A protein has these predicted regions:
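Solvent-exposed beta-strand sheet faces enriched in polar/charged residues
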Residues: 47-49, 173, 192
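Short connector loops at helix/strand junctions that flank enzyme active sites
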Residues: 103, 127-131, 173, 184, ...
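Short loop/edge segments at beta-strand edges and connector loops
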Residues: 85, 172-174
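N-terminal lobe of the biotin/lipoate ligase/transferase fold
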Residues: 2-163
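Long, positively charged amphipathic alpha-helical accessory segments at protein N-termini or as interdomain linkers
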Residues: 1-27, 37, 41-42, 143-146, ...
Length: 251
């Protein structure tokens, strides 16, 4: 319900009465008040005015299940979000979801990874509160030999999402990177799958986007960049996640 109430607040330019929210979601005023208090604790600025109702004043760069689900307007890509404040790897968690029978389009997101994965066993720097670490679970009806094409589709979706949200021009560096116009890495993609000879059980596509990161390790600082460094200002991560998922569904 929190995601739905947050979506309603974002869609309104004026105050929403508590009674209106109660009737729409068939809950009590106390339940609505509790949701508003939870949102305030998460950093949302919400005005509550007697005889007028509630109004969303400002949304911070919050990474949460409710925030992401309130922004995504797809039919299946990212409609179900599994969120971790901290985990080892979103690809690992997404593969667990795949083994448990999670639905096509399930999106696993973390605010921090302790063992982020790159290609060829490399690690992916994943500090807290700065960037996007997410993996989408897919159950495509294609032959395993065609699975690598899905990496390219995600790369296209990511470039489109970045341009839509920020206006920044970037490019795809085959097979799995997105780079700035100066050639520095903004984003990496890792695709893994569980398959038989002629059948895919599931595919997981992990994507890491350097969004608001300003410092990189000595090892990669000469070849890595972030949207914040390129633009000169910070970007709301949840908004970018939604844009990438919407572009991916259309690919």
């Amino acid at each position: 319900m929190k995601s739905e109430i947050l979506r309603l607040l974002k869609s309104s330019d004026t105050y929403l009465s508590g009674q209106q929210i109660c009737e729409q979601f068939q809950v009590s005023r106390t339940a609505v008040w509790k949701v508003m208090e939870q949102l305030k604790k998460e950093g949302y600025q919400i005005e509550a005015v007697r005889n007028k109702g509630y109004r969303l004043v400002d949304s911070p760069d919050v990474m949460s299940k409710a925030e992401i689900e309130s922004l995504i307007s797809t039919k299946w890509a990212g409609r179900h979000v599994v969120y971790y404040g901290e985990t080892d790897s979103t690809n690992t968690r997404a593969k667990e979801q795949g083994e448990r029978g999670a639905e096509h389009g399930t999106l696993v997101i973390a605010d921090k990874q302790n063992a982020g994965k790159g290609r060829r066993g490399r690690s992916w720097e994943s500090p807290q509160g700065t960037s996007i670490y997410m993996t989408i679970l897919l159950r495509p009806g294609i032959m395993p030999v065609k699975a690598p094409q899905m990496t390219l589709l995600m790369a296209i979706a990511a470039t489109q999402g970045i341009r839509r949200v920020t206006g920044l021009e970037d490019g795809i560096k085959w097979p799995n990177d997105i780079v700035s116009l100066t050639g520095k890495k903004l984003c990496g993609i890792l695709t893994e799958m569980s398959a038989e000879i002629d059948y895919i059980n599931y595919v997981v596509i992990g994507i890491g986007v350097n969004v608001n990161q300003e410092l990189f390790s000595q090892e990669i600082k000469e070849r890595a960049t972030s949207l914040c460094l390129e633009l000169g200002h910070k970007v709301q991560r949840s908004q970018l996640i939604a844009a990438i998922m919407e572009s991916f569904e259309k690919c």
